[in-house]
Amino acid sequence: MKARVKYAIAIGAALWMVPLTQAVAGIDIAAGDWKIDFSGNINAFYVDASCDHGTDNAVAGGLACTGDNSAAVRNGLLPAALVFSASTRQDNLDISATIGFYPGINSSAAAGVNGAGLPAALQTPGIDARQEFLTFGDASWGTVKLGRDIGLFAKDAILDDMTLLGVGTAGPTNIAPSNTSLGRIGLGYIYTDWEPQITYTTPNWMGFTGSFGVFQPLDDGAYTAHNSPQFQAGLAYSFGDPKSDQLTGKVWLDAVTQHAKAPSADVATNTAYGIANDVSGSGVDAGVKVDVAGLEAVVYGYYGKGIGTTGLYVLATDAVGGERKSDGGYIQVTYKLDKLKLGVSYGISDLQLADGELTSDLVRRNDSFVFGAYYGITKSLTLVGEFIDSKSKAHDGDEATEKDVALGAILFF
């Protein structure tokens, strides 16, 4: 299997993912002192993908498809979802529990849920549950979250991506669709992922909030031993009231870092061949979102060393443990005319060679243009049309292009 397909399949498998946008409030039920909420979505799209038929199009880690063109009826960037939450206040504490199930409409040949665990980027727990967490806290001192939920690093990048309601780049798996497309993942930001975590979030103070957490460390290629957690942190400032103000928006800054080691069984061999026995990876990102009377702009960027591209700690190091630098970002502008939102965005994700690494077909850049139209038939139902032009370039000069047309609908409840 080509490297580009392997990465796309891994990402698609994990993308049963992002929390539901606040399109609707959900279905609330009072049960004694508890408030029970059910929410979710169903979506489906027809996607026509025109792939690269050239001869010099091998890009390891490239996200543009090559070979046969394909037509598919599939999920978009979001899978379907059914999210259950329960909340109450007891003994001066706000407490809640959330479980989210994320199926899709496409056939799957995945292994059963009782297989061995794999604590690496883009993985999922059994029984298709992407969210399983509890919270407790109070408005006076903040909230503690324990369980599995979306990460902090690059979270806002994907939640503000207009292709969240659509498809974005279909990628190499469109010929045999996975349950999610790529959107702008790996083409403007690194996937935030869903990770086991213990996270504290401060109270909102005049628009400012902060979150800090310890996370399950992720495997980094052959570096699968961990004696310390992954750390993530985020700061954000929001301004304006969407219900009353013409000008609203937010600014955010996030960071991620972790340390990984080679298994003890590999240490002697690594030492003999000059291969590093431990690696570190850290990254930062920042973004701005501004909305003025229906005209919305998002500017986002990230930089890291040893954090990889597309997914956290994917392609982060070379064969001897050299840490690769990566950076990227996207610009997006949308305008809402009554029920119709029109949007355009461009994003890139770059991956550099490690110091001393030889030139190869390793991906150097994935980038894409997206043109989208999103029409709200009701507050719950949206029709979507997108055109996507994606390109992958390798360090040795090979490149591939993909053009997608996506038409479909998404329903939130």
Question: What annotation goes with each model-predicted range?
Answer:
Residues M1-D28:
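Cleavable N-terminal export/targeting peptides
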Residues G26-D48, C65-D219, N227-P229, A236-G240, ...:
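Outer membrane beta-barrel
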Residues A31-D33, V73-P79, P125-A129, Y189-D193, ...:
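Transmembrane beta-barrel outer-membrane domains
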Residues G32-G40, R89-I95, S140-V144, M206-F208, ...:
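Outer-envelope beta-barrel architecture signal
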Residues G40-Y46, A97-F101, R148, F212-V214, ...:
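Transmembrane beta-barrel strands of outer-membrane/channel proteins
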Residues T66-S70, L118-A120, I185, D220-A222, ...:
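Extracellular loop and loop/strand-boundary signature of outer-membrane beta-barrel proteins
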Residues A233, T401-F413:
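Outer-membrane beta-barrel "beta-signal"
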Residues A233-F371:
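Detector for outer-membrane/organellar transmembrane beta-barrel domains
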